[in-house]
């Protein structure tokens, strides 16, 4: 039998959200506002923590790095999505699609590991407050940050290593606004049952286990707060509550997408928007609105900028 000739697709067509021109313009303006807010909010956190010496603590060091990840994470999908709103045909090259998958999972995986590091930071702060600065020293903080990035890199490489050998000979239509593993895998011209199982294990099952472990960790921390004084307990409880909100905002949509990733649902795009576009914008708002120290530091930074201009 002669081998069947297959042509590898050179690009994918993204269906996006709507084919109506008026709605496309409205969505462009809406998501442009969201993206600009995301950039400004996360940059504000990074600048404030960098220039305010009162925030040079392990918790804010980690928060600054999380803001950097959020900024980069939104940049993986949002600029391409905004450009596509202005074009009738939305395409992405095969290489661009693979690059988007790599950086999407690098930063997404890094976020998951970062949230774990921040949970550990809060545990040390509550359980051993007198030794907190000694334990969470600069060397350990930098090591934990590097470990989070390495964890995200390993997770991303695994995703890419499973997809790159696959043949894509058509169709090439992705029912989404960006490239991700579940949608791309459906287009492969071969049986992907084993890969689907591996992807669910690497993403879906891992996300569920990690989410439960983080919830248990914060429950333990909140229980430990009972032994603290009123003011310190309220401040620590507020910080932990903020972390739980952020963890839930990130993990719940991911569980929805990656636990049943190869069966398309009507809500897939809306859920994808929630954690690829909305969460990076909401994170800095949540951390600043519930954090008196951060708000005070931003006011000091604003006053300094006004004085410098005068």
UniProtKB/Swiss-Prot annotation:
Please give the biological process terms from Gene Ontology that the record holds.
Answer: sensory perception of smell
Cytoplasmic side, ranges: 50-57, 121-139, 220-235, 290-310
Specify the glycosylation sites in chain numbering: 5
* Any one cellular-component term (Gene Ontology): plasma membrane
Q: Where found in the cell?
A: Cell membrane
Which terms are listed as keywords in the entry? Cell membrane, Disulfide bond, G-protein coupled receptor, Glycoprotein, Membrane, Olfaction, Receptor, Sensory transduction, Transducer, Transmembrane, Transmembrane helix
- Paired cysteines (S-S): 97-189
UniProt-recorded Gene Ontology molecular function terms: G protein-coupled receptor activity; olfactory receptor activity
**Pfam families from the UniProt entry:** 7tm_4
Q: Where is the major localization of this protein? A: membrane
Report the family membership. Answer: Belongs to the G-protein coupled receptor 1 family.
What this protein is called in its record is Olfactory receptor 4D1
Q: Origin organism of this chain?
A: Homo sapiens (Human)
Q: What is the lineage of its organism?
A: Eukaryota, Metazoa, Chordata, Craniata, Vertebrata
